[in-house]
């Protein structure tokens, strides 16, 4: 009894020391672009609130071509891909960008996950780095779960972990989001929460297909698990999902359709959005020329800083020439097609401060690919959008933009100059779009607790209490047939059928007896 009391006191003293001096947090990021941006922001938030933060970062040319990493206030441990493989990986990204108009989304997604599995083997073979990370004895990891390898790294290091993801994962495995398929669209379904019968049928079949695809993706990592985990303790991804202390999704209900989620889920959409800073004098002079018409911002995210298809660029450039607004377009100047004359109202720039431009009082519209960070920043500043989705979740995001009356979208294979110009005119000229954007901005800005405070408080809570087992529902331990009461429905059906059968049998017996009695009476 005394030993147990001493252990409890020692545990409480350790937790008090950790909270007093800051927990040791490892953030894990193996992909650039917007993924790096939000992991960097989370790392800075935790560092600025007294945590001892280290980021385990994969650095590779081609992933962050235009983003110059600022000097990080937190510690960085980096690793890089083999030069020969890096060339192959960069070519994969380049091909995806060159062929985005006709690419097969499924094969492209599987191709990316195949590359992630190959990179995972390389990470685990970095024994000196892995040993260094293990010796640090981190209290908690925050991972970018879009790359499944981050789960395995955390498990190998023996660190409890928080998973971040760009959108809510509606999975048969446990990701904190119950699967209510009647009104919760499955990833890539391009549906809203208002589904008719055939749309619900589509949603169910896509859910089944996504479950099959998930198992296919996670099987790509079987070799890593078999090689680097003992046979007696090899984890499955289903187990790792269940072990996740907290799911943090880069969205919120300003853009997401309302739905339930478990207590171990936190929506942090808009964490990158900030009050705008003044733009450069050069940009201010250009914007001033727009007069009352204002200007629009055009950017296709950190992964597609320019567009290799001259036809696509020509349609956009021609479309912009038909509108009175000034246009600030993030596009690599060195890659502008020489055969095209830049429209007189367009200014192209290698890099733009999107958040600051969106917060400018003359900003009228954002033309976007539909990335989560761009959408959340536009909502924060109350700017409507025209989306031209290119990859993955961007198609679903574009549907949400339209459903929330934040703007409209144009399918990438239907982009024409006149169609783009008309869409811009309709959204800027339609007062209801601006009103919707301003209303959602108010919702996002007036939430009781800022996103950065929520992140900090949750991390402190998890470190203090040693996990979130108290928030995990029992459904995590139930098989699907119990979760959905299939056994109960089967039992009820058997009882009803049995009761009907017995009733019919009894009626037949009664009728036969009655008929026999009448015959006897007649005789």
UniProtKB/Swiss-Prot annotation:
Residues 1-23 form the signal peptide. It catalyses: glucuronate acceptor + UDP-alpha-D-glucuronate = acceptor beta-D-glucuronoside + UDP + H(+). Residues 505-523 are cytoplasmic. Glycans are attached at residue 125. Residues 24-483 are extracellular. This is UDP-glucuronosyltransferase 3A1. Pfam families: UDPGT (PF00201). CDD domains: GT1_Gtf-like. Disulfide bonds: none annotated. The keyword Nuclease does not apply. The chain crosses the membrane at residues 484-504. The keyword Glycosyltransferase applies. Belongs to the UDP-glycosyltransferase family. Its EC number is 2.4.1.17. Keywords: Glycoprotein, Glycosyltransferase, Membrane, Signal, Transferase, Transmembrane, Transmembrane helix. Its main location: membrane. One of its GO terms (cellular component) is UDP-N-acetylglucosamine transferase complex. It is found in: Membrane. GO terms for molecular function: glucuronosyltransferase activity. It is a single-pass type I membrane protein. It comes from Xenopus laevis (African clawed frog). InterPro entries: UDP-glycosyltransferase, UDP_glucos_trans, UDP_glycos_trans_CS. UDP-glucuronosyltransferases catalyze phase II biotransformation reactions in which lipophilic substrates are conjugated with glucuronic acid to increase water solubility and enhance excretion. They are of major importance in the conjugation and subsequent elimination of potentially toxic xenobiotics and endogenous compounds. It is an enzyme of class 2 (transferase).
């Amino acid at each position: 009894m005394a030993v147990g009391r001493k252990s409890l006191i020692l545990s409480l003293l350790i937790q008090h020391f950790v909270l007093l001096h800051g927990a040791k947090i490892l953030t894990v990021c193996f992909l650039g672009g917007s993924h790096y941006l939000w992991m960097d922001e989370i790392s800075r938030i935790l560092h600025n609130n007294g945590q001892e933060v280290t980021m385990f970062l994969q650095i590779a040319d081609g992933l962050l071509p235009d983003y110059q990493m600022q000097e990080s206030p937190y510690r960085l441990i980096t690793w890089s891909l083999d030069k020969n493989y890096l060339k192959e990986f960069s070519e994969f990204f380049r091909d995806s960008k060159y062929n985005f108009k006709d690419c097969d989304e499924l094969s492209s997604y599987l191709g990316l996950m195949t590359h992630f599995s190959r990179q995972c083997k390389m990470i685990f073979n970095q024994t000196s780095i892995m040993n260094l990370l293990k010796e640090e004895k981190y209290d908690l990891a925050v991972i970018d779960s879009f790359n499944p390898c981050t789960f395995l790294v955390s498990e190998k290091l023996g660190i409890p972990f928080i998973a971040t993801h760009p959108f809510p994962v509606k999975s048969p495995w446990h990701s904190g989001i119950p699967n209510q398929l009647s009104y919760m669209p499955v990833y890539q379904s391009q549906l809203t929460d208002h589904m008719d019968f055939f749309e619900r049928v589509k949603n169910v079949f896509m859910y089944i297909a996504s479950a099959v695809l998930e198992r296919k993706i996670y099987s790509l990592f079987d070799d890593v698990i078999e090689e680097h985990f003992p046979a007696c303790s090899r984890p499955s991804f289903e187990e790792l999902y269940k072990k996740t202390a907290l799911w943090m999704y880069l969205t919120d209900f300003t853009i997401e359709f309302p739905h339930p989620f478990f207590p171990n889920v936190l929506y942090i959409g808009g964490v990158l959005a900030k009050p705008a800073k003044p733009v450069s004098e050069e940009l201010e002079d250009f914007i001033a020329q727009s007069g009352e018409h204002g200007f629009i911002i055009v950017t296709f995210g950190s992964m597609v800083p320019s567009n290799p298809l001259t036809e696509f660029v020509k349609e956009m450039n021609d479309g912009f020439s038909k509108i009175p607004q000034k246009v600030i377009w993030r596009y690599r100047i060195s890659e502008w097609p020489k055969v095209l004359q830049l429209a007189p109202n367009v200014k192209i720039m290698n890099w733009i401060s999107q958040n600051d431009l969106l917060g400018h009082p003359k900003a009228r519209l954002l033309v976007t690919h539909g990335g989560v960070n761009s959408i959340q920043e536009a909502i924060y500043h109350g700017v409507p959008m025209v989306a031209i989705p290119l990859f993955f979740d961007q198609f679903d995001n574009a549907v949400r933009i339209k459903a929330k009356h934040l703007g409209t979208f144009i399918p990438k294979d239907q982009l024409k100059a006149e169609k783009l110009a008309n869409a811009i005119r309709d959204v800027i000229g339609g007062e209801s779009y601006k009103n919707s954007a301003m209303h959602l901005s108010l919702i996002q800005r007036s939430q009781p607790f800022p996103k950065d405070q929520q992140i900090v408080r949750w991390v402190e809570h998890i470190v203090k209490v040693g996990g979130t087992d108290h928030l995990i529902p029992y459904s995590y331990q139930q098989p699907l047939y119990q979760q959905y009461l299939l056994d109960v429905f089967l039992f009820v059906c058997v009882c009803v059928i049995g009761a009907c059968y017995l009733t019919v049998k009894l009626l037949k017996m009664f009728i036969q007896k009655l008929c026999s009695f009448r015959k006897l009476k007649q005789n």
